[in-house]
Amino acid sequence: MTNPVTQKKSLKLLFIAPKGKKDSKTNQKPLFHMAIGVLVSLTPKEHHIEIADEHFEDSINYDGDYDLVGITSRTIDATRAYEIADKFREKGKKVILGGLHVSFNAEEAMAHADCIVCGEAENLWATVLEDVSLGCLKPTYNAKDFPPVTKIVPLDYERIAQASKREKVDGSKSIPIYVTRGCPYECSFCVTPNFTGKLYRSQKPEDLKRQIETAKKVFFKANRKSSKPWFMLCDENLGVSKKRLWETLDLLKGCDINYSVFFSMNFLEDKETIRKLVESGCNMVLVGFESIKQSTLEAYNKGHINSAEIFSQVIEECRQAGLNVQGNFLVNPDLDSFKDMDDLVHFVGKNHIFMPIFQIITPYPGTKMYWEYKEKGLITDYDWEKYNAINLVIHSEHYDPIAFQHKFMTSYYKTYSWINIANRVKHNPYKLLNLITSLAFKKNLKEQLNTFECNHNIRTTRSIK
């Protein structure tokens, strides 16, 4: 007598993007979490999908009849992700956890889930769904046990829109997309080399064009202020060679969009690349300057990148071409003094850097820095909600942690003084965008600074306007 064949069933899935209590407030968040967008696009059509994104104040239905609840998590969202997972499991639901944080904290995450996924899901998700359908879900699925991911999954924007119930937006809200994945560099503070990997992958031109046109149709609504949609390119590094970069920019030029992108300083030293960026619709590049000190850049494995003088020159060339440069800077108590912070504030103001971002160096799980600091016993706090880059979670030989954080926050806030905002708007292109984003940052930073001073009984006669 033969055993009956077990039939796979159609599943009802809920994908959740949690928001940590100390996650930053921003008006620049993309319309959906890219990890969830990829999962939706990988999931066969016979399965029903719902999305709940707490960054958009979506409510979570804990009483839904879901066959599987999938939760993705960054480090800052991990505590909230575990809270949600525990609540669903109390109600007897199957929970799967994945994402950056879970991939490098598997043992911790296992206590809150029926199953965890480590690494990229592209080549393992079909197996997970099949096992759920057959009632034999395994405790762990690790990307290392599956064939390497060599392609980018085209996003199914129609299905994402249907599952998320997100309304159409104008050109002031960003639609996320991948053009490439992977990065060949090994910056010590970055998780990309150990998660996405160093293998550089590009979208097929026809796939990219089709996705952009579909995204326009389901997510964009033109108005008097914006005739083109704004896409946020979520690539870790858009170009690894000038030839491939220019091919990508020529392709984007024909798509009639505006976009912003993370970009390597190396390519911005070429004026023709700047011109092609602008002509292809790029209105903003986010550049990881990290520091204006050469010794600090070398400590981060970025010593090959340049100097403050070249930074200033490139920023001005971009500005003259019509391109905003958003600068990201890291502050490290082992490498940077209070005077260095003052110098950084001066540099940002002098160069009118668009929407500057300051971050205290944070050893995120999965980075080379995390393993080094943990091995040396230098991590002082494992409260993941504090891993938002404005809290000091590492040991400092030179500074009191509270004094260092306060200096950092006041320095950061100074870059959004009224005079700096006015000069930024005056000197940069896209003046309305500069004003709106600067005001939002100023409001958020003021709230964070006031809360910090209140919590630590810091009295100040601050005169920052």
Model regions and ranges:
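Radical SAM enzyme core and accessory elements
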Residues: 2-15, 45-51, 67, 132, ...
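Acidic, low-complexity intrinsically disordered segments
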Residues: 2-217, 226
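Flexible glycine/acidic-rich beta-alpha junction loops that bind and position SAM and/or redox cofactors
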Residues: 22-23, 105-108, 295-301, 331-339, ...
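Alpha-helical structural signal in soluble globular domains
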Residues: 42, 46, 87, 91, ...
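Short, electropositive alpha-helical surface patch
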Residues: 66-75, 246-252, 256, 337-353, ...
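Structured beta->alpha junctions
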Residues: 73, 77, 101, 121, ...
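Structural recognition of alpha->loop->beta junctions
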Residues: 108-127, 276-286, 343-358
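Radical SAM [4Fe-4S] cluster-binding motif and immediate context
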Residues: 157-326, 333, 339, 346
